[in-house]
């Protein structure tokens, strides 16, 4: 069968399946492609194709992730599914596969399990905006009261981690029934019901171009007679010639005006998200700007030194540390384009962190960095990556 070409005129959304091992995440992913393929919105991808996910590298960390894509009436989706629990942890922390929302899969036969809890917590920490729940394997539970009990448990767990537990849609069904065409109501119909809820409940993400301008500084040049040019890739938003911007991070915030934008040696009137540009700054000296700072829309981003983070620490096999670390560990934190030294404070009751652990910790940087929640970073020792993290909340 010829692959149907995806129309790119629908809004795009990135989602993924999360939940405990063997609760049916991969089966559900396969079932979604099967049911949506009936209306031409997907190409059916079988369980074993998804299960042997290829390895990818993100921030120096190897992660196995399977990607499928499909579309509903309203949206085009890119969907990620990971084979192992460790892959989920790494994926969510590194942001290798950005999630605008997630489908939490819970087996009705088992109810919430340790990884269910951990994935909900991770989703909260890394800032996944919305979850929809698929209560799977409902064909294995005969007692409707038991189903209600499991649903209640899931809602309580979601509320505990500050998701709106009483509002989140929970769809009861069976991925296997959908794959085997055995029970239309729990299979086919439940999958369509799930996708209707994903369409409606997961908010449409704001496109990078619509967000406030930000560009990490990669290099700085002085051009005689013209001034200082700063180069980098625009992360989000648009910058127009003549606009005022701020230079944020590493030192006191400065205001300046962009007097020129060039790309591939051509002068433009603006630069936008995704463009590699050179920005000419009025009255800014070569020594006033350095790599590691950002150019940003005034007031849109502030420099900070103290934050709470969720981090994954590489194993020895992944090229990480061979030994644990303790409170007051001082590695470098690599944000966007530069390393900054910081001091780690472990939570009360956590004696040490072993390679392979993921951990919530507090970090105090020795100089401020332009930062906001959800910003990703690498943890490095002498240029070698030993971990990855995400800003969960800012302290000061």
Swiss-Prot record:
Keyword Hydrolase set for record: yes
Region annotation (G5) ranges: 174-176
Binding sites annotated in the UniProt record for GTP: 19-26, 81-85, 136-139
Binding locations of Mg(2+): 26
Region of interest (G1), ranges: 19-26
PROSITE patterns for this protein: G_TR_1 (PS00301), G_TR_2 (PS51722)
Recorded catalytic activity of this chain's protein: GTP + H2O = GDP + phosphate + H(+)
Region (G2): 60-64
Alphabetical GO biological process terms: translational elongation
Bridged cysteine pairs (disulfide): none
Domain tr-type G: 10-206
Record-listed E.C. numbers: 3.6.5.3
Segments for region (G4): 136-139
GO cellular component: cytoplasm
Keywords for this protein: Cytoplasm, Elongation factor, GTP-binding, Hydrolase, Magnesium, Metal-binding, Nucleotide-binding, Protein biosynthesis
Subcellular location: Cytoplasm
Region entry G3, spans: 81-84
UniProt GO MF annotations: GTP binding; GTPase activity; guanosine tetraphosphate binding; translation elongation factor activity
Pfam families: GTP_EFTU (PF00009), GTP_EFTU_D2 (PF03144), GTP_EFTU_D3 (PF03143)
Assembly information from the UniProt record: Monomer.
Role this protein plays: GTP hydrolase that promotes the GTP-dependent binding of aminoacyl-tRNA to the A-site of ribosomes during protein biosynthesis.
Similarity comment: Belongs to the TRAFAC class translation factor GTPase superfamily. Classic translation factor GTPase family. EF-Tu/EF-1A subfamily.
Protein name: Elongation factor Tu
Record organism: Bradyrhizobium diazoefficiens (strain JCM 10833 / BCRC 13528 / IAM 13628 / NBRC 14792 / USDA 110)
